[in-house]
Amino acid sequence: MPVQTILEVSLSQFILKVLWLDSNVALAVDQVVGKGTSPLTSYFFWPRADAWEQLKTELEKKTWISEADRIALLNRATDIINYWQEEGRNRPLAEAQSRFPDITFVGTA
């Protein structure tokens, strides 16, 4: 299993994960547990569906997540979606990774 460097979204408890594809971008959130992570949400795809709204709804169901953490995660999700939509889908994954060093990119097609 490859070693992943996990960079924080200024949220030591959560990691925003991104699957970077040619025709979609997918977003998910993991919770940091000890030295590992546990999936908190499934992947939500943009533009196939409204990933941002689905992520927001899923995070709101988890009432133990603070509003500040929810907002921070959703703001970063907005940044990723906007970048992918405006220019990122035509750019290499490495460029997205360098632009968003606090996000965990988990793969491509």
From Swiss-Prot:
Record keywords: Ribonucleoprotein, Ribosomal protein
InterPro entries documented for this protein: PSRP-3/Ycf65_sf, Ribosomal_PSRP3/Ycf65
Pfam families: PSRP-3_Ycf65 (PF04839)
Transmembrane segments: none
Gene3D superfamilies to which the protein is assigned, alphabetical: 3.30.390.140
A single Gene Ontology CC term: ribonucleoprotein complex
GO biological process: translation
Origin superkingdom: Bacteria
An example Gene Ontology molecular-function term: structural constituent of ribosome
Family the UniProt entry places it in: Belongs to the chloroplast-specific ribosomal protein cS23 family.
Reported function: Probably a ribosomal protein or a ribosome-associated protein.
PANTHER family: 30S RIBOSOMAL PROTEIN 3, CHLOROPLASTIC, OS04G0461100 PROTEIN
Subunit and partners: Part of the 30S ribosomal subunit.
Record-given protein name: Probable small ribosomal subunit protein cS23
